[in-house]
Each structure stands twice: as C-alpha cells, then as structure tokens.
C-alpha cells in the first residue's frame, strides 16, 4: 500500500533528575555532597532510508517517544543519557510542523538526517550546588522535560519525468510499456490511486518516470485526492501529457488537455514552466486516427509538440522517448546546492511572559517565565525553595515585584504554594 502523507506525535526524552546524596565512608566524618547529575534525554532524529518508498508504517503507529535520561547517583555518578530515537522515512520526505506549517526539513539525500527535537537536559545533583557558604546543599535539580510536537510528513516522489492526464488516458499502460514497472491497469475512473515509478532505459540513456494518478477538475482545491497527486509533480523536470485522442471515455481531447493544464496552473504556476510534450494516445483505435489531425493542429497552436502513440501496441513510443531524452539533456543542470548531512531544527521559543497579580498583600506569580523556573525545583523542599528564591532574584522577577510595591517579608504565591520572601 502506498501512503504519502502522515501525521505523528513526537517527543524527546526527559532529562534525568539530579540526586541528593552525601559521601558516607568509614573514617570520613563530613564527606560532603556527592549527588550526581541526571542524564540527558534522547533526541528525535529522522533519517532518509533509500530502501523505503512509502509512509505506510506511520498509518499504524502515531506516537514516537525517545528514551528518558536516567537519574544521577551517589558518588558523583552521572545518570546514563537516554538513547536517541531514529525514525526512518523515504528519501524525498518533507517534515512539517503541524501547528505552524513551517517546513522543518526536506530529506532529499539517502541517509540524510534531521535532528528535530533535542532531549531535555539532566538536572544537576547536589554536589554542583556546594559553595563555601553552602557546604551541604540538600536539594538537586529536576531534569528538563523533553520537547514535544505533532509533525506532518509528506512524501514527494523524485522523478525526472511525470506522466499527467485524465483517468484512463493510458498513463499506466505507457509506464508499463516504457519500463519494467507493473502498475495495475483497468478501465475504471481513478484506476491508479497511487503514483508508480519506473526506470526507462532507451538507447543507452536512462531516467525515472512517474505515473501521476489521474486528475480531475477541482484537483487544485484537493478534490478527488488532487493535492495528494499534484504534490508529486513538483519535483519532476518535465511532463508528458497523455491524452486519449480517441475520446473513448466520451470526453473531448482538447478540453481534457486544457482542463489538466488549468489545474496545474491553479495549483502552482511554476508547474506550467516545466517542459511539456503531448502524447496523443490510443492512435491504434479508429476514432483516434480520425481525431488526431484536428487535435494535433490545435495543440501545436498552443506551442506544444504532439506525438501520436499507442501505449498498448507501443506504436510511436520510440519517437516519444527520443524527444524526452533530448529535452532532459537540454535542461540546464541546477547548481547543486550543498545538502547538509545533518539538519538541526531549532523549535521557535515560546514567548516569555510574567504575570503579577496583587491581592491582600499577596503577590501571585504566573506565566511562561515562572513555569520555566519551576520545572527544575521542588517547592516542598526547604533547600530547593531557597534555590528557587535565588532564581527569582537572578532572573529579575524580584525586581519586577518591587515595581509593584513588593517588599521584604511579603508573601509570594506560585501555583497555590505560598511563602514569605526575605532579603
């Protein structure tokens, strides 16, 4: 089954907690603090696997969580770092922030990596807080929580030539005639519901051809799976527009041609700048032979070259492929942009806020600034509370409180925990 979009939840590992510990050794009366730091949480890393061709795995599993770091230990032992989580995706996968729509990474190279979420830092053990004036700190930091987010994955096929046209125009048959690909072929609307790829080898040259599923009017708005199909055209170098010139489906070949190009234009005008040649298919049918002269005349008026073919009997295929190779050879090679082996994504920082509300001489603190400070302390522990007070001073919160009339001895309330602050 071919799946080219997915939405998944990812979370980096939490940092391990620092530990409170004191050296206990025979003949050492005052060993001092020896609590070790917690380990770092595991990162979430995407890797482009050349052996994958679909996002099918993500249909059955939606949550991916990296390993947490281990807590620190006594004797100044650090906790073990959490293992990084590697998520394999096909080459050509876009990773998008589902909330903002921001493109995080475009993995276009085999084995290319994207570090999307960094694991939380480990908390510091009490040994790190020992000072000449605080020789036996009885508190430690909690580990930092790993970041989390929902991401959208979109697979865009990497092909040189895209086959476009209405359903049943003969694209799958043409792909099968030119390559060893074996797409399912039948005479039903939307016969091909997934793109198929094949390698064309012709007169010593080779290129990748993609059969883009049949489009309908309104495809640019997403109708008839339109967005899913049009996405795959974006990376192609040129297009072969397959038209059923026999009108076997009861449609007018000229109108078919115009409608498909209109859909391309409405989706992205850049698609119309791609080189495009027209394959007038089903020329082996009597109505195809009769319709071809008028069709060719109209298409040439629009500036396109037309090649009469029969994808079924392979009539005219050689000339079509000759022209395709000629065009591909003439397309200037894009200046190769250096593709980084590893992409490191930095999520947008949450805007820092500090809210102060005063009621009955009690100062209520809230906001992202306070949340960040609280993540690494335990207010129920007296020593940790003293450390929190120091953080309030260093971060400028106490100065902000003083601007509101706060003075030494007043009460501070944080998440319903109240304490008196003295300088």
UniProtKB/Swiss-Prot annotation:
Its cofactor is Mg(2+). One of its GO terms (molecular function) is magnesium ion binding. GTP binds at residues 165-172, 190-194, 211-214, 281-284, 310-312. InterPro entries: G_OBG, GTP-bd, GTP-bd_Obg/CgtA, GTP-bd_prot_GTP1/OBG_C_sf, GTP1-OBG_CS, GTP1_OBG_dom, GTP1_OBG_dom_sf, OBG_GTPase. Its EC number is 3.6.5.-. The keyword Cytoplasm applies. GO terms for cellular component: cytoplasm. Residues 346-423 form the OCT domain. It is found in: Cytoplasm. It is an enzyme of class 3 (hydrolase). Disulfide bonds: none annotated. It comes from the Bacteria. Keywords: Cytoplasm, GTP-binding, Hydrolase, Magnesium, Metal-binding, Nucleotide-binding. One of its GO terms (biological process) is ribosome biogenesis. CDD domains: Obg (cd01898). Mg(2+) binds at residues 172, 192. Residues 1-158 form the Obg domain. An essential GTPase which binds GTP, GDP and possibly (p)ppGpp with moderate affinity, with high nucleotide exchange rates and a fairly low GTP hydrolysis rate. Plays a role in control of the cell cycle, stress response, ribosome biogenesis and in those bacteria that undergo differentiation, in morphogenesis control. Monomer. Belongs to the TRAFAC class OBG-HflX-like GTPase superfamily. OBG GTPase family. This is GTPase Obg. It comes from Thermoanaerobacter pseudethanolicus (strain ATCC 33223 / 39E).
């Amino acid at each position: 089954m071919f799946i080219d979009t997915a939405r998944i939840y990812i979370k980096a590992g939490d940092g391990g907690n620092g530990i409170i510990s004191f050296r206990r050794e025979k003949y050492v009366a005052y060993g001092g603090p020896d609590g070790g730091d917690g380990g770092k949480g595991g990162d979430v890393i995407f890797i482009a696997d050349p052996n994958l061709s679909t996002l099918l795995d993500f249909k059955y599993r939606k949550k991916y969580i990296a390993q947490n770091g281990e807590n620190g230990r006594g004797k100044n032992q650090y906790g073990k770092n959490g293992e990084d989580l590697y998520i394999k995706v096909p080459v050509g996968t876009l990773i998008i922030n589902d909330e903002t729509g921001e493109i995080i990474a475009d993995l276009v190279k085999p084995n290319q990596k994207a570090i999307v979420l960094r694991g939380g830092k480990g908390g510091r053990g009490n040994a790190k807080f020992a000072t000449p004036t605080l020789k036996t700190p009885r508190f430690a930091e909690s580990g930092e929580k790993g970041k989390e987010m929902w991401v959208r994955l979109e697979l865009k096929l990497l092909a040189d030539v895209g086959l476009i046209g209405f359903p049943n125009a003969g694209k799958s048959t043409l792909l099968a005639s030119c390559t060893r690909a074996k797409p399912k072929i039948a005479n039903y609307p939307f016969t091909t519901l997934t793109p198929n790829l094949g390698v064309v080898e012709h007169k010593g040259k080779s290129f990748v051809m993609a059969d883009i599923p049949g489009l309908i009017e309104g495809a640019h708005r997403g109708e008839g799976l339109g967005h899913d199909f049009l996405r795959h055209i974006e990376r192609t170098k040129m297009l072969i527009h397959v038209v059923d010139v026999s009108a076997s489906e009861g449609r007018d070949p000229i109108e078919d041609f115009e409608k498909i190009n209109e859909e391309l234009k409405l989706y992205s005008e850049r698609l119309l700048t791609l080189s495009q040649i027209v394959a007038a298919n089903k020329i082996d049918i009597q109505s195809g032979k009769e319709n071809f002269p008028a069709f060719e005349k109209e298409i040439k008026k629009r500036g396109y070259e037309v090649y009469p073919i029969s994808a079924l009997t392979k009539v005219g295929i050689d000339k079509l492929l000759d022209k395709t190779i000629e065009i591909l050879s003439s397309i200037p090679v894009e200046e190769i942009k250096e593709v980084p082996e590893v992409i490191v994504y930095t999520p947008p920082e949450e805007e820092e806020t500090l809210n102060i509300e005063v009621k009955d001489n009690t100062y209520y603190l809230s906001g992202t600034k306070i949340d960040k400070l609280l993540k690494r302390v335990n207010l129920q522990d007296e020593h940790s509370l003293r450390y929190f007070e120091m953080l309030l001073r260093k971060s400028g919160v106490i100065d902000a409180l003083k601007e509101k009339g706060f003075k030494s001895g007043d009460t501070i309330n944080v998440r319903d925990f109240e304490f008196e602050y003295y300088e």
